[in-house]
């Protein structure tokens, strides 16, 4: 249950304070700290697409002697974007989420489905990089796209282009 998971996470956090990287929470904290340091070295435009894995794993064999522990993902969507695309990427991510949230501010079941998809993605992105994972990324795209398309079709039954051409006349 949730209480057990939260309690276990705090226990792992305390263990990680004593010996970093030995628990799942400890590894995440280590990855987050390293991600912040990487962001500081290229804060505006980042290190480039696909650079996170290389940058996050380049010191692993030196420290542990084994590349098996290499994790090339900070398990945080904001940090992943910050490493790869800097502040510009983070602003683009937050702008996307903001537009999606505004899209689903209306009433009705479709708006609620879209809103739940966006909020779930934002919250889960604190502890993972779902937009970059194949299944979760496509699920988000499909859920938001279908819900937004349905809302648009309901609002403009004759089509958006027809409404735009009528407004020009």
Question: In which residue ranges do the predicted regions lie?
Answer:
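Long extracytoplasmic/lumenal interhelical loops at the membrane interface
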Residues: 19-33, 41, 45-85
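Hydrophobic residues in alpha-helical segments
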Residues: 39, 82, 105-108, 126
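Generic recognition of well-ordered alpha-helical segments
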Residues: 12, 31-34, 55, 77, ...
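Helix-loop-helix junctions and helix-breaking kinks within/between transmembrane helices
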Residues: 1, 87, 129-130
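A membrane-periplasm/extracellular boundary helix in multi-pass inner-membrane enzymes
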Residues: 1-19, 33-41, 49
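Hydrophobic transmembrane alpha-helices and their immediate junctions
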Residues: 84-119
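Signature aromatic-anchored transmembrane alpha helix within multi-pass, membrane-resident enzymes
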Residues: 1, 165-169
